[in-house]
Amino acid sequence: MLLFTKLAAPKAPKRRSRAGCTSCKERKKKCNEERPQCSRCAERGSSCVYEPVRPRQRRKRDSFITSLADASTNGSHQHEAEEDDHGARFDRFDACEDHLSQHQRVSHDWGHQPWQASMPDSFDDDLIFSPLDDTFDPNVLLAAAPLETSSVIINPDEDFTGPLSSTTQPRVLRYEEDDDDGEEEIDIGGGGAGLIGIKHDRRSSFTSTTTVATNTTAGNTIFSTDLTICSPATVRSPLLEFTCPSFSEFSENPRQRSLVDHFCNVLSHLIVFREETGNPFQQLVLPLMRGGGGGGNNSPVADAVFALAGAHLEHRGVDVKGGEKSLYFHHRAIQGLAGLIRMHNAGVNRNEVLAAIMLLIYYEVLVQRGRSNIVEGHLKGALTVMCSNPEPLDSTGIFLERAFRFYDVIAALSFGTAPLSTAPAAGCLVPFPISAPTATSTLNNVDSLLGMATTLWPIIHRLSALLPLKTDVANARDAGHNGKVAVLRTEFETTVGAVEAALLGWTPNLPTGWVLHESDPTKLVEDTTAAKDENSTGEEKRSGGDSARLHSILNNALAYRNSALVYLYRTVLSHPRDHPLVQRHANLSLRHCAATVEHQGPMGALLWPLFVAACEAVTGADRDTARTAFAAIDKRQGMTNIERAWDIVQEVWRRAEGGTEETVRGEGVRSDTSPAQLSMACSRELKGTADMWRVVSKEMGVNIVFG
């Protein structure tokens, strides 16, 4: 409890030492004042001379200052009280008075009269603004006072290309001061700063001038305002008083901001391969959260982001209290998406619709609720939007279309149906991002969603259409349409041969200076036989930090290649589990999956090749490899489909060991039968081939999308 008040004694103003040696003063360096020789002079081997310290000189106050102080007694008393509390203001007040008196003697004869209550203020009330007002313009404050030219040195090599705005980069001031009373030099640095230095009186360094650089339509202009002349001070921005919460531009709700934070800092990194130029979900999808929501409602993209992030947290057992569950945001996203589709012809952003659909597909893949065809319905909706409005694609459109193609093929392989889109021509897919590749990066050939499998994806797209084509052959055979059977069978056999040859001949596009190891296909080594110039050598040295990520991305692509061959031989051509081709490529695929996990690289697209190869694993070593890989990706990704896929794999192993697996083979067909003969025999016996894992999945009542 405060019993009495007492004015604190004024603090002694801090003074700079002026007793340094002459050598340090000339160089404008700080002197430690050691005798007989300071450390700087001792280091340079120069003579160290100390001069007597001269007393400080103060300018005499003119009668104007005296009359001004007498006329404003109340203001003086208030200033003296502040001076008692803050002694550091003493010098600033003296400097202000000295500058005013000097300005009166040299420049003007103003003839000021003592202030009286009847006299109007020199500044109109209209010049006092609030930065929260819509009409607030900082340029009015700058133009309110007379301008005074400062001694400014302009670098001719620098230019001022931007207007004075909130995005202007701040200047970093570096003071280099002399120990004597006199001038001090301020170096203004920073990117693109055109000011080299400003020289002014040291005693008025805090109050005399403020220099601002701006660009007008007539040309570049540098001006300074004298704060002792323009008396009211500029109003500080309220944003300087507090820190805005992260992601406050997307939502005012703390719970929703935490979901955006989880999406940006966790989820977006789990589903891409390449982030050296930025995460595409953060750069391209996140800005779409601001659109589409009218009347205070969130946009469908925002609700889909909230649903996806919330479902991922809920699956990991994280209960973020104080907000709605992911299912609530999912329903809102569905309703908002339906409204956007109804208004699609009214100028609604096409990318916003596609982004909402793709995020909802990610949500459905994550939660995996029973045997539903919601993913297929979303994919059909996305295809309808893309076909109904074939606009020129920007970066966001290209990225969303790439994500659609990925899930279209993965869903076709998962459900055994034909893909909705047409297969892209060979060589038409280029790695995303397309623009501005980094010259020294080893990941220039890596796609953000497909990794190194960009050139492999058209082949896998054609592979996914083979099982439905085989089913069509069987249906035509049962219906007795012999002509149709002949046409479809020819198409099937031709496509099978082309896909098999393409898969066996495919090789990843490796970065410069790297080749596959001859004995271990999971490793990359430096190409020592090829001639290297200085630039390629530098690239190899700089790529050492990305070596682990590069190995992981490479093994992911090779796992897709070998699992595609397993799918071709086992599912499409109905080879038995113990067939040499099936076991060879299943073993290679599991080795590549293990190498992907070992290098701790991206694992977002590893589930399908790992699942296909693990279902055909026979030996204990292969099953241990599959078990380790499943545990690693489940720990990293935290998705429901990974857990359910692992449950199905274990059930397939149990049935295979118990001899209860339903093997589909034609009568009199040997294991070395050609693919064409085997496909004909299978088409006569059954309407397609049912994999054991599909039977198990149906019995468990789930549909798994291996994305």
Swiss-Prot record:
Official protein name in the record: L-arabinose-responsive transcription regulator ARA1
One Pfam family here: Zn_clus
Keyword annotations of the record: DNA-binding, Metal-binding, Nucleus, Transcription, Transcription regulation, Zinc
Gene Ontology annotations of biological process type: positive regulation of transcription by RNA polymerase II
Deletion phenotype: Shows no growth on L-arabinose and strong grwoth reduction on arabinan and arabinogalactan.
Motif Nuclear localization signal: where in chain: 14-21
UniProt subcellular location: Nucleus
Species of provenance: Pyricularia oryzae (strain 70-15 / ATCC MYA-4617 / FGSC 8958)
DNA-binding region: 21-48
GO CC annotation, single: nucleus
Function comment: Transcriptional activator of the arabinanolytic system. Involved in the regulation of extracellular arabinanolytic genes and in the regulation of the intracellular activities of L-arabinose catabolic genes in the pentose catabolic pathway (PCP) in response to the presence of L-arabinose.
Region (Disordered): 527-546
Family annotation (CDD domains): GAL4
Classification via SUPFAM superfamilies: Zn2/Cys6 DNA-binding domain
GO terms, molecular function: DNA-binding transcription factor activity, RNA polymerase II-specific; transcription cis-regulatory region binding; zinc ion binding
